[in-house]
Regions:
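ATP-hydrolysis module of ASCE/P-loop NTPase motor domains
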Residues: 101-119
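Acyl/amide activation-and-transfer machinery of modular secondary-metabolite enzymes
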Residues: 76-85, 133-138, 175-177, 312-317
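Short intrinsically disordered coil segments
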Residues: 101, 153-159, 331-339
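A gly/proline- and charged-residue-enriched helix-loop-helix capping module
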Residues: 77-104
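Aromatic (often tryptophan-rich) hydrophobic motifs at membrane interfaces
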Residues: 95-98, 210-327
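Active-site/acyl-donor-binding loops of N-acyltransferases
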Residues: 124-148, 289-360
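Short catalytic-loop micro-motif centered on adjacent basic/acidic residues
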Residues: 108-110, 179, 293-295
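A conserved beta-strand-loop-helix scaffold within acyl/acetyltransferase catalytic domains
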Residues: 3-54, 58-71, 113-134, 138, ...
Length: 360
């Protein structure tokens, strides 16, 4: 018997959720309880959708009801996470998804989900209706062999020489160190350095830095603490004469890892500290046993990471539904979502055009 429910306070099921993550069909680190429960605590309007089989949790996904232009359910998109990949029990993937969809009298939107692999197969099996509203590929790293071999084969000699030159020039500015967060180390300074460095750059000036909203700052801080306590947080920093000039974090779950925020001192941009930090982090992923794929979580065609990590992961945004949802209602939701996305893209282009005109 499959029981479906939604709750606004998932703290009560933290242990069950953590257990589900350990036996998940595929790792879903961006929706881990350590990462998401602090966001529930400090941001409003979301619930945890869950499915149980004989009392055991077999599906967990943070969701939020959307009501315009039509009512439907979607994975919870926050300033920290846009992934709609749920935790699914390895032995109940398709059946749990089917029960979740059947519970809804409206379509369900899942954004930023893998467009191939076991979860995709289970979703196609469970959904009576499925439409892809967007599909893309983004950079990823699949560590295999040694970092040295990867580095030699991934970059031509000219590029390797340029990276050495950048690191040498940066080292000439002072004592350069690459540091990584150690198990049991106090994570608070790492969090503060990332928040402060990001706020000092263009995101701070635009008002989109994590530090621009107190609720986001608090959620991020608590999430990093919880992830670190669970052994699921990775952090790297480039430090020049004791001052952090670039920093980045990642979440890890099972065989997967996902890059989080990366930020750098913009006054040192000519030395490409972000690129150097990515290379240092890449080396550590090659030395970490069990990691088979690192998702960059970057936009497709990203000018930096796409030229460093050559592997790709296929992603998609989809609208799905059970047979309980009429074809008419489903089609209307898909059309409305496509219109909304087109309007958003147009508005963004106009905004950036006005910004460029204002600066010129």
């Amino acid at each position: 018997m499959l029981d479906v429910e939604r709750r606004a306070a998932p703290e009560q099921v933290r242990d069950d959720w953590s257990g589900l993550a350990r036996r998940a069909l595929v790792p879903a680190g961006l929706n881990s309880p350590e990462f998401m429960i602090p966001q529930f605590r400090h941001m409003d309007g979301a619930e945890l959708a869950s499915v149980r089989e004989s009392g055991a949790l077999v599906l967990a996904l943070p969701v939020k009801r959307r009501r315009f232009p039509s009512a439907f359910l979607a994975n919870w998109v926050t300033p920290l996470n846009v992934s709609g990949l749920p935790h699914l029990d390895y032995n109940h993937g398709a059946s749990a998804l089917e029960a979740f969809l059947r519970r809804e009298a409206a379509p369900v939107m899942l954004t930023g989900i893998p467009a191939d692999g076991p979860f995709w197969d289970a979703l196609q099996c469970a959904a009576h209706r499925l439409t892809i509203v967007d599909r893309w590929e983004r950079a990823a790293l699949r560590p295999n062999g040694s970092f040295e071999t990867w580095y030699e084969t991934n970059f031509e000699r000219k590029r390797r020489k340029e990276y050495r030159r950048l690191r040498t020039r940066l080292s000439e500015q002072g004592r350069l160190e690459c540091l990584s967060l150690k198990p049991g180390e106090n994570v608070a300074p790492w969090i503060s350095n990332l928040l402060d460095l990001e706020a000092a750059g263009w995101k701070g000036r635009r008002g989109t830095a994590l530090k621009s909203r107190n609720s986001v700052t608090m959620a991020f801080t608590e999430a990093c603490r919880d992830l670190h306590s669970a052994g699921k947080l990775r952090f790297w920093s480039l430090v020049l004469d004791g001052r952090t000039i670039a920093t980045m974090f990642a979440t890890v779950e099972g065989s997967g890892a996902w890059l989080g925020k990366i930020t750098h001192d913009e006054t040192l941009a000519k030395f490409s500290p972000g690129v150097l930090l990515i290379l240092d982090a890449t080396e550590t992923f090659f030395s970490e046993a069990g990691i088979t794929c690192v998702d960059s979580c970057a936009v497709p065609g990203h000018p930096m990471i796409d030229n460093i990590w050559r592997d790709r992961v296929a992603m998609a945004d989809v609208v799905v539904a059970s047979a309980n949802v009429s074809q008419k209602k489903f089609d209307f939701t898909v059309r409305a979502e496509n219109i909304r996305r087109n309007l958003r893209t147009t508005a963004r282009h106009i905004f950036y055009k006005l910004i460029r005109r204002h600066r010129s």
